[in-house]
């Protein structure tokens, strides 16, 4: 905010934290109009600091409550100023100063201590104002008589500017820096409503509770600047020299640096007091244009104010009802990391690119399941890949050992033994994961068979929905020449057979099948009488249910690609495919993946799975006492798998037995 200086040189400067004290208000050497103008200047800035102090020191939970509290205090202050008692004999309305002239002389009304006390607040005592004594007034009049013609001309022009600016003030309002003299906030003029606008404070640019300390910001620059305020400058006398002094003001409320332009006083003239933080007094010679820095700062403040107004007036985009409901139902997930693309150079041209696969799965699953789409993309290329054959080679090598040791035998704790033990454990992990898939599928097949038996038993017990007109018993009686009375005998016999039938099962087929599995696996365990009681039977039952749930997705893979598809899915590796993640996927998601895999890689996956066949399981599990066949991929070194391409005949040929592979190569 820019305020004009008076003709006379103000009293000496005082620290800003001691504003509005007895020394600052002792303006006896000034005339009445300039004294009132400077008083209003200090009161406005003091009120602004106190408002920021209220917001900063408020103990409310959030900023909205603190802003509401400050708004209530401000409206109460405006109401007290607008009352007729305070307006009578109060401080005259200081104008928005400009360079236009007016013939109306200013009204020099003495400042009222009650009004100053009201603006200052009731929480602190206000020191009595020091008004000029009659002797000081006579001294001031004598000094005026000794003024030079240039000073008199400047003083007349100053009075005209003040008078005309007062006329330009909107009716019922004070200056642009003071609150309007109206209680109803909706009836305020546009220029005065900015003072009651607390949205700028909530934007975090002017003030922010909790992050105020240590943040450097210019409070005045962040407030909207009116066009009249941007021109509040007066021209000094021609012989006046102007110097610029930079003053750093420290305040407990606003941690910022303010620049104050103070004219160089003549010898023997008291220096003006430094106004509060955020006030800038500038004087320049007449007809001198604004400096580039001042003009750029003014344009920057105007652009910032326009941006705030545009932001507040722009409505937020409204979502449709379907989009809003879908956004509420979707679970927000963190942005997943991008998958490794080191293997993309081995993808042939006939396969879709990773970006296309990811976009397809994202389209089917939704953007809220981006991590699952990335997992399915990696799994799409991992099945039957060279990396899968490399892991299978290590697992087969481990399974062929008669007594595989977890840790290699070594008397010394050297580095080579440690690395060899870790490689051994990785191979055991791959072997255990592959065998676990096979045995989980077998467990699910047992449960499915028991469930089908119970479904068949239920269907056999239920009577047919429609009785035949001629049942088998009646047809036999007719053939044998029996009469109609025999039908009653047949009906009575059928009723007796129905009575001999067992009552219907009370449980579902799946639950009954699960109970049969528990009975066969743990015949000595009995369920607890009280429901929800923790016992060994309930723990075993929970573990069995979890295993059946994990086997659900592997069973779908086995049904889609019969043979050895379960052995062609790598564990971790460079594709970062987690087995737990695949087991926890929903059924519909797995079905979407299998359909897409059938469409683009179905021929190759089915061929390599059938080529390995069931012989690979007998090698891994060592279920056959006979000599297990040796496969061609067992003879490939670890570095050789890096040169293989996806979905090629070479990968299929490595899946056959080694003897047949040698015969094919010799014939070729």
Swiss-Prot record:
The coiled-coil segments of this chain are none
**Basic and acidic residues bias spans:** 495-505
Biotechnology usage:
Due to their effectiveness as antifungal agents, echinocandin derivatives can be used for the treatment of human invasive candidiasis.
Record region (Disordered): 1-20, 92-113, 224-322, 330-349, 483-506
* Pathway the protein contributes to: Antifungal biosynthesis
Q: Where are the transmembrane segments?
A: none
- In the UniProt record, the signal sequence range is none
Q: Where is the composition biased (Low complexity)?
A: 484-494
Q: Mark out the compositionally biased spans (Polar residues).
A: 96-106, 311-322
The highest taxon in the source lineage is: Eukaryota
Q: Where are stretches of biased composition, namely Pro residues?
A: 264-275
What's the stated role of this polypeptide?
Part of the gene cluster that mediates the biosynthesis of echinocandin B, a fungal lipidated cyclic hexapeptide that acts as an antifungal agent. Linoleoyl-AMP, produced by the fatty-acyl-AMP ligase ecdI, is transferred to the initiation carrier domain (T0) of ecdA. The linoleoyl-S-phosphopantetheinyl-T0 is sequentially extended with L-ornithine, L-threonine, L-proline, L-homotyrosine, L-threonine, and 4R-methyl-L-proline to form the linear hexapeptide. Thereafter, the terminal condensation (C7) performs macrocyclization of the NRPS product and the cyclic scaffold is released from ecdA.
The protein's name in its UniProt record: Echinocandin B biosynthetic cluster protein J
């Amino acid at each position: 905010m820019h305020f004009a200086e008076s003709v006379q040189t103000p009293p000496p400067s005082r620290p800003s934290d001691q504003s509005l004290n007895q020394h600052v208000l002792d303006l006896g050497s000034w005339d009445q109009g300039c004294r009132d103008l400077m008083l209003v200047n200090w009161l406005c800035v003091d009120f602004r600091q106190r408002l920021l102090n209220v917001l900063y020191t408020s103990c409310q939970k959030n900023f909205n409550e603190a802003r509401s509290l400050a708004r209530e205090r401000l409206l109460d202050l405006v109401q007290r100023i607008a009352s007729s008692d305070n307006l009578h004999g109060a401080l005259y309305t200081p104008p928005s100063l400009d360079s236009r002239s007016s013939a109306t002389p200013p009204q020099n009304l003495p400042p009222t201590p009650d009004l100053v006390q009201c603006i200052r607040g009731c929480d602190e005592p206000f020191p009595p104002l020091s008004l000029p004594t009659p002797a000081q007034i006579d001294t001031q009049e004598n000094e005026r008589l000794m003024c030079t013609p240039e000073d008199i001309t400047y003083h007349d022009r100053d009075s005209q500017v003040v008078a005309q600016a007062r006329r330009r003030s909107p009716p019922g309002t004070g200056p642009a820096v003071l609150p309007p003299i109206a209680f109803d906030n909706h009836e305020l003029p546009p220029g005065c409503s900015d003072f009651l606008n607390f949205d700028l404070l909530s934007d975090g640019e002017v003030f922010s509770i909790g992050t105020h300390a240590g943040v450097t910001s210019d409070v005045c620059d962040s407030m909207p600047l009116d066009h009249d305020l941007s021109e509040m400058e007066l021209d000094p006398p021609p012989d006046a020299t102007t110097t610029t002094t930079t003053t750093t003001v420290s305040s407990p409320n606003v941690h910022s640096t303010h620049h104050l332009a103070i004219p160089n006083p003549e010898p023997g003239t008291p220096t003006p007091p430094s106004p509060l933080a955020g006030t800038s007094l500038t004087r320049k010679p007449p007809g001198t244009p604004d400096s580039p820095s001042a003009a750029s700062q003014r344009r920057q403040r105007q652009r910032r104010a326009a941006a705030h107004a545009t932001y507040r007036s722009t409505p937020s985009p409204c979502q449709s009802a379907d989009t809003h409901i879908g956004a509420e139902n979707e679970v927000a997930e963190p942005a997943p990391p991008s998958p490794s693309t080191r293997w993309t150079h081995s993808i042939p041209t006939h396969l879709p690119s990773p970006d296309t696969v990811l976009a397809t799965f994202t389209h089917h699953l939704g953007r809220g399941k981006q991590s699952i789409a990335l997992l399915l993309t990696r799994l799409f290329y991992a099945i039957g890949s060279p990396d899968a054959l490399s892991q299978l080679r290590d697992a087969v090598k481990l399974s062929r050992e008669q007594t595989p040791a977890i840790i290699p035998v070594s008397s010394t704790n050297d580095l080579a033994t440690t690395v060899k033990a870790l490689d051994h454990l990785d191979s055991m992990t791959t072997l255990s994961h592959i065998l676990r898939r096979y045995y989980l599928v077998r467990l699910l097949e047992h449960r499915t068979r028991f469930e089908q038996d119970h479904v068949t038993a239920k269907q056999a017990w239920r009577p047919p929905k429609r009785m035949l007109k001629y049942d088998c018993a009646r047809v036999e009686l007719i053939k044998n020449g029996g009469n109609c009375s025999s039908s009653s005998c047949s009906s009575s016999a059928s009723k007796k057979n129905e009575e001999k039938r067992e009552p219907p099962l009370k449980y579902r087929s799946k639950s009954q099948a699960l109970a049969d599995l528990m009975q066969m696996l743990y015949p000595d365990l009995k369920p607890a009488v009280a429901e929800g009681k923790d016992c060994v039977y309930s723990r075993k039952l929970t573990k069995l249910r979890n295993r059946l749930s994990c086997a659900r997705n592997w069973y779908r893979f086995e049904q889609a690609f019969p043979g050895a598809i379960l052995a062609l899915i790598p564990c971790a590796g460079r594709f970062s495919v987690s087995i737990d993640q695949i087991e926890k996927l929903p059924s519909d998601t797995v079905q979407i993946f299998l359909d897409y895999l059938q469409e683009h890689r179905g021929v190759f996956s089915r061929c390599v799975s059938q080529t390995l066949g069931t012989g690979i399981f007998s090698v891994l599990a060592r279920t056959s006492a006979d000599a297990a066949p040796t496969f061609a991929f067992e003879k490939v070194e670890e570095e050789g798998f890096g040169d293989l391409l996806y979905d090629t005949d070479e990968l299929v040929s490595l899946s056959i037995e080694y003897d047949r592979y040698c015969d094919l190569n010799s014939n070729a």
